[in-house]
A protein has these predicted regions:
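Mid-domain alpha/beta scaffold segments of enzyme catalytic cores
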Residues: 1-224
Length: 224
């Protein structure tokens, strides 16, 4: 079963996220697990308009590969990356690719919750969005759950300890991202925050991820 919804190192049971050139290498090398492909907001700082267009074309092409099960990570970062306009252009283009191929969009959000939620409304997005590394508080988590169906919140090594309990159980995911901790230890920390039975978060998050991807017609259990 897939349990780790976001990492940067291919592994069985994990979705590794990378830029187009990285994902192309993983596919060629037969790396394990499944993949998401996208233009990280940090990368937009170094991209000319022509380079951004070329990268978006690569994302669109790779998005149709069977082992690429999601788009991103894409999003907004107020602390790092290109201009607001360039980040927005890259994000909206990737959100539209996700809609076109019917695969989830993985979000990178730093100090910009409002812009992401406004984009969800404006696009009338139909595919799920996975908010990777969610560090918002319980009030923000509850607002997202209440007002924005289709958004899943994923918790990594660092998170607001009150937030997981505010997430609808069916929308909770876990990830390693760049942490050295294994996914079961991260899930155990979320267990403690939720006051749940040890091991239950990992099982819940795995079932949620399988259902999320299966609902989009992608079945990573068929991947290596």
């Amino acid at each position: 079963m897939f349990t780790d919804c976001h990492t940067h190192t291919p592994a069985p049971g994990a979705i590794a996220s990378g830029a187009p050139e990285q994902v192309r290498r993983w596919l060629a090398d037969g790396a394990p697990g499944a993949f998401s492909v996208g233009i990280h907001p940090w990368a937009t700082a170094a991209l000319s308009p022509q380079a951004l267009a070329a990268q978006l074309s690569d994302v669109e092409m790779l998005a149709r590969c069977e082992r690429v099960v999601a788009i991103g990570e894409a999003g907004f970062d107020r602390l790092r990356g290109g201009s607001r306009a360039v980040q927005r252009e890259a994000f909206l283009a990737q959100a539209k690719i996700a809609e076109a191929v019917g695969k989830p969009l993985v979000l990178h959000v730093v100090k910009d919750i409002d812009d992401v939620l406004a984009a969800r409304r404006g696009l009338r997005a139909g595919v799920p969005w996975i908010w990777h590394g969610f560090r918002g508080n319980a009030l923000q988590a509850a607002q997202i759950m209440r007002s924005y169906p289709g958004i899943y919140l994923s918790f990594g090594e660092k998170f607001n300890k009150a937030a997981p309990a505010a997430v609808v159980p069916g929308c909770l995911l876990v990830e390693t991202d760049e942490s050295a901790l294994p996914i079961d230890e991260i899930a155990a920390r979320v267990d403690a925050s939720r006051g749940s039975i040890p091991g239950s978060t990992l099982s819940l998050a795995g079932a949620n991820l399988q259902r999320l991807l299966g609902g989009c017609g992608v079945f990573p259990e068929q991947s290596r």
